[in-house]
């Protein structure tokens, strides 16, 4: 092998011999086979290799993908999410009273100030959707960028790195490993927030075998999962009431 050939090979290598973590957490090199420009952050849609156009029939309404993610909880569609709306949103998803209360309090207290239009805090802890990108924490998957766009390659990397049992699903243990692998140094808030967020998603959308599917995660990013789960839960409640 010539020096030029070696340089060309090394330029595309994804595993470093003396960095074992690069061997255990593999990355894919075939993303652009079915997904155009996978490393390009998307502002309006959340595509993956199986859904290169994003979620069918999901309306973005001009919101960024991160804004779409939280818009489900804006029950009166005024662009502001108050704690009682967060609480009601979790109830619509099927969470019990105590869990909904704890999650609503924690989310609005943690995120409100960063999204406020001014410097003075609000005793009502509102979350302003147009500023939700300012509440993005560290130690996350980097699937959202700092402006609230969605990077499809980073969704795919979750599974190439951590899905060791089923290629397109993550077990609870694999989710834990992922949150550990995403930790930024001394980011204590981000460590906790990441584990809580993924734990809530696992409780909401894991299947009967204890796995969280890639499709559920993708649809969580654009918020369409919440609409789907709320509709299913409402139908179950109606069925139980009827019978």
From Swiss-Prot:
Tissue: Expressed in roots, cotyledons, hypocotyls, leaves, shoots, flowers, siliques and dry seeds.
Gene Ontology terms: biological process: defense response; oxylipin biosynthetic process
Reactions this protein catalyses: RH + ROOH = ROH + ROH
Keywords: Acetylation, Calcium, Disulfide bond, Heme, Iron, Lipid droplet, Metal-binding, Oxidoreductase, Phosphoprotein
Pfam families reported for this sequence: Caleosin (PF05042)
UniProt-annotated location(s): Lipid droplet
Enzyme class: oxidoreductase
GO cellular-component term (any): lipid droplet
Positions annotated to bind heme: 69
Disulfide bonding pattern of the chain: 220-229
Domain notes: Transmembrane regions are predicted by sequence analysis tools, but these regions probably constitute hydrophobic domains associated to phospholipids. The proline-knot motif (117-126) may be involved in targeting to lipid bodies.
Subunit relationships: Homodimer.
Family designation: Belongs to the caleosin family.
The name this protein goes by in its record: Peroxygenase 2
Organism name: Arabidopsis thaliana (Mouse-ear cress)
Lineage: Eukaryota, Viridiplantae, Streptophyta, Embryophyta, Tracheophyta
Gene this protein is translated from: PXG2
């Amino acid at each position: 092998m010539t020096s030029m050939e070696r340089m060309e090979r090394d330029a595309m290598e994804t595993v470093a011999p003396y960095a074992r973590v690069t061997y255990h957490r593999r990355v894919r090199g075939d993303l652009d086979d079915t997904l155009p420009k996978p490393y390009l952050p998307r502002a309006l849609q959340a595509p993956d290799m199986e859904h290169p156009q994003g979620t069918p029939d999901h309306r973005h309404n001009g919101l960024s993908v991160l804004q779409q993610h939280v818009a489900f909880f804006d029950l009166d569609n005024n662009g502001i999410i108050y704690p009682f709306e967060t609480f009601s949103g979790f109830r619509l998803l099927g969470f019990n009273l105590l869990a909904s209360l704890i999650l609503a309090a924690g989310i609005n207290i943690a995120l409100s100030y960063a999204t406020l239009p001014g410097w003075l805090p609000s005793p009502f802890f509102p979350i302003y959707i147009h500023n939700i990108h300012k509440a993005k924490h560290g130690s996350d998957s980097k699937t959202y960028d700092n402006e609230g766009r969605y990077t499809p390659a980073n969704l795919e990397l979750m599974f190439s790195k951590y899905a060791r049992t089923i290629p397109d699903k993550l077990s609870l243990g694999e989710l834990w490993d992922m949150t550990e692998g995403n930790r930024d140094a001394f980011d204590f808030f981000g460590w906790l927030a990441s584990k809580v967020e993924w734990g809530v998603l696992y409780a909401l959308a894991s299947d009967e075998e204890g796995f969280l599917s890639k499709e559920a995660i993708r649809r969580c990013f654009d918020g369409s999962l919440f609409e789907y789960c709320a509709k299913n839960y409402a139908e179950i409640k109606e069925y139980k009431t009827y019978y």
